[in-house]
Amino acid sequence: MPGGCSRGPAAGDGRLRLARLALVLLGWVSSSSPTSSASSFSSSAPFLASAVSAQPPLPDQCPALCECSEAARTVKCVNRNLTEVPTDLPAYVRNLFLTGNQLAVLPAGAFARRPPLAELAALNLSGSRLDEVRAGAFEHLPSLRQLDLSHNPLADLSPFAFSGSNASVSAPSPLVELILNHIVPPEDERQNRSFEGMVVAALLAGRALQGLRRLELASNHFLYLPRDVLAQLPSLRHLDLSNNSLVSLTYVSFRNLTHLESLHLEDNALKVLHNGTLAELQGLPHIRVFLDNNPWVCDCHMADMVTWLKETEVVQGKDRLTCAYPEKMRNRVLLELNSADLDCDPILPPSLQTSYVFLGIVLALIGAIFLLVLYLNRKGIKKWMHNIRDACRDHMEGYHYRYEINADPRLTNLSSNSDV
């Protein structure tokens, strides 16, 4: 039945049968002893009623709005607009799906139950509009190995979300897979702090995730990875950083990730991989690297990477890698380039660059002073311009007068006679 509960063999049915059997026996005893039947029933009935009513919640009951399968050890509460984690989850649950809800906040001890959810191994909370995960939210889940928080706008992820409310005394987390794809919140909800830093703090707190084998951080608009972030995750086998905005891996060290098998760096903003990164990747024995759809800049700085690509086998689909810049190299396949193709525009020595910068500053100051002088003397300059204009006008009028006399012979003779 949609949205209903599909339960396995119910322990509650057994208890109900026992209660009915007790009532039948009580009735038989009452009928065999009529004088004491009324008093026996009146004294025993309250006890039986209280015994039945005092039974604790059945450990295999299915929460409202959820679907349960004891055989598969699975509970699904999907797209039910739940605002909190159900409190009556069955103790047998091993796989719990709480996707597509309206949880908003995951408080400390959100999954603490009596009896505890000791078998819960896989927890999926994706797409539940979580914007805050508090310290100790996943405490009391000793078997939790896979956690999916994808597609939640996590504006506030506590540093102790995965390590417990007190990382200094908490045991290592049992998590093996942590999926945090597309958890970046809107810009106006980031509380004026680095989103990358918030996520990394949660990953590294108390060194609780040293057993983590799979980490997915795709589609989070990461611009960089903080220094040594991966050094404290030595058990990683699969790392997904695809579809971010990473421009460089200069400060990221892969040296300690000796078990790393796959590294996804597709769809980032990488321009070149430098020698240090190339050497570390080449030193990992089982690594497969994915580098598709990055804007590679094919200039003289790309020479070492091109040489490495031609020799290594760790890069998957390396024949698909193409240049994005400069314009003359666009869509050229990296494996087809040689050293003659990779050149850089001449670069001025640093000392000469400094001289030109200083000269530009001096000229700018001189120009500013000149404009200030002109502004302060604007009235005098205006008067001087009027005088120049009047002088030019008088000069031109005299010129036109002489020209008219010279052009008319009668005026010329008249002028000569008047001179005589």
Swiss-Prot record:
Database matches in Pfam families: LRR_8, LRRCT, LRRNT
Entry keyword set: Cell membrane, Disulfide bond, Glycoprotein, Leucine-rich repeat, Membrane, Phosphoprotein, Repeat, Signal, Transmembrane, Transmembrane helix
Extracellular-facing ranges: 32-355
Domain LRRNT per the UniProt entry, residue ranges: 53-91
Stated consequence of mutating R214E: Impaired trafficking to the cell surface
InterPro entries the UniProt entry points to: Cys-rich_flank_reg_C, Leu-rich_rpt, Leu-rich_rpt_typical-subtyp, LRR_dom_sf, LRRNT, Wnt_signaling_inhibitor
GO CC terms in record: axon terminus; cell surface; dendrite; endoplasmic reticulum; plasma membrane
Tissue: Expressed by all types of trophoblasts as early as 9 weeks of development. Specific for trophoblastic cells except for amniotic epithelium. In adult tissues, the expression is limited to a few epithelial cell types but is found on a variety of carcinoma.
SMART domains cross-referenced by the UniProt entry: LRR_TYP, LRRCT, LRRNT
Species of origin: Homo sapiens (Human)
Classification via PROSITE patterns: LRR
Keyword Membrane among UniProt keywords: yes
PANTHER family for this protein: LP06937P, TROPHOBLAST GLYCOPROTEIN
Protein name per its UniProtKB record: Trophoblast glycoprotein
Known function: May function as an inhibitor of Wnt/beta-catenin signaling by indirectly interacting with LRP6 and blocking Wnt3a-dependent LRP6 internalization.
Glycan-carrying positions: N81, N124, N275
Positions where Phosphoserine occurs in the chain: S418
